[in-house]
From Swiss-Prot:
Described function: Binds to the 23S rRNA.
Protein name: Large ribosomal subunit protein uL15
Subunit text: Part of the 50S ribosomal subunit.
PROSITE patterns linked: RIBOSOMAL_L15
Composition skew (Basic residues), residue ranges: 13-23
Gene (name only): rplO
Cellular component, GO annotation: cytosolic large ribosomal subunit
Pfam family, any one: Ribosomal_L27A
Length: 150
């Protein structure tokens, strides 16, 4: 059996007619329209807005405005300036493990990022997760190279 656009039908009971309130007892929702006898919730102009607590100071105004939420998916780096790399020998391949072994870094928790503060006088091959533009320039000026890893 092929389905054609003109033969499509909605499921039984999925499309109910809107209940017309206040149109007599025989209509099923006459008189008080299912809102009860008296009170704010039975009056016209109902319902009250979301968060309304009957005149009491609402929760969203009682609680202080929260600031300084942590940035979601923020990348944290172990940072190291170019000037600290002068302690290494010429032609060394620099990575996180070597820096810990040489005592330049202690207990790094995050990937390595090289910053461009200071002067570099040694030719190195630096492997890091990130470089600033000035750090990359200083490493390449001396004849070294920058390698990215994740």
């Amino acid at each position: 059996m092929t389905i054609k656009l003109e033969s499509l039908q909605s499921n039984k009971g999925s499309r109910r007619k809107k209940m017309r309130k206040g149109r007599g007892i025989a209509a099923g929702q006459g008189a008080s329209c299912g809102f009860g006898m008296r009170g704010q919730k039975s009056r016209s102009g109902r319902p009250t807005r979301p968060g309304f607590e009957g005149g009491q100071m609402p929760l969203y105004r009682r609680v202080p405005k929260l600031k300084h939420f942590p940035i979601v998916n923020q990348k944290n780096f172990t940072v190291l300036n170019v000037s600290r790399l002068n302690a290494l020998k010429d032609g060394t391949i620099v990575n996180l493990d070597l820096l810990v072994k040489e005592g330049i870094l202690t207990k790094p928790k995050n990937p390595l990022k090289i910053l461009g503060n200071g002067k570099l006088e040694v030719k190195l091959t630096v492997q890091a997760a990130a470089f600033t533009a000035s750090a990359k320039n200083k490493i390449e000026e001396v004849g070294g190279s920058c390698e990215l890893y994740n």
